Amino acid sequence: DVMSDTLTENFREQGAMEAQESLDSHNSMNNHGTTDSSSSTKELAIERDLINQLTKGESQWVYRPDLNSEEKLWDNFFEKLEENNVRTLADHPLTYSEKNQIKNQLNFVNFYEAAKWIAGENGIAKVQVQREDASLGTIRLEVLWRNNVAGGKSSYEVVHQVMTGGEGIRQRRGDVTLLINGLPLIQIELKSRSHTYMDAFRQISKCDREGQFRGIFSSLQMFVVSNVTDTRYIAAAKANKLNERFL
């Protein structure tokens, strides 16, 4: 069961539960008469409140407003990957071709396959790279460590309004995404109180049907949906497998 995986459970505690706390705070403020001119303005305000809640104080989460496209997410991921595998790379940075090998490995056919990879070998998720320089052979790079979640050398970043789509797929901007070591693992869809949380759930389903969760977003493990007053979460699944009863 994906939801019982230690990694996912910790994300639930650090992401979804903090999201609920932030959204409850925002709800309390709105109950005292705060209004916005449009639904989209309200939703952006909710996003800002959530990001502030996740990153305030001594939180491990870092807000990265510069990461606003899939290309930038990949660049950030490879930066983390090289930082975490200095000894294995032995002063030979990844080439363009080698990065494409890794991108192909991380373009999962569904979220369940991503979950199996994240479970890893002895709790470590790795990618294999055939070095372009044949004399360097084949190496395995560590991406995620289950025993390092919530500490250690893992990095925790928050991004929002990342542009997805292109090449025949409608372009959209996601609400809030949580990254671990550069990989998107939790997608949060937010609606204002004039909508139900099911509107956010349907938006997630629509994005999947449109093909928004491909490439680097195919590693997602949890969806969080909220309309400020109600927040629910569910293990990531393809649109035809998402069941609202499990929210």
Residue locations for each model-derived region?
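An alpha-helical interface "stripe"
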Residues: 2-247
